[in-house]
């Protein structure tokens, strides 16, 4: 069998744009605000407090009150990672302990 009788191999590559994690930023003050809305496709969510003030988070059907809910300490983070039977697709509200413009980074796992 000569080399011309062998099947030709073709190099293939396939690139898919990564959509996860999807990042966003919320700036919080001393009033409860929506930090992220509901997403049916969300498998998990990570909240990162890169600021110097404590931030409190609650599901969007509640009003955030400082210190009453999921507390994210300064330079800390909180992760909610789903599985086949648990998802974290609700919206979230947040509030800062004091001041304004306090950053909350959000990574959505889609």
Residue ranges and their predicted role:
Residues 11, 42-44, 77-79:
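Intrinsic-disorder/low-complexity, polar/charged segments enriched in Ser/Thr/Lys/Arg/Asp/Glu/Gln
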Residues 36-37, 73-90:
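Beta-sandwich interaction modules
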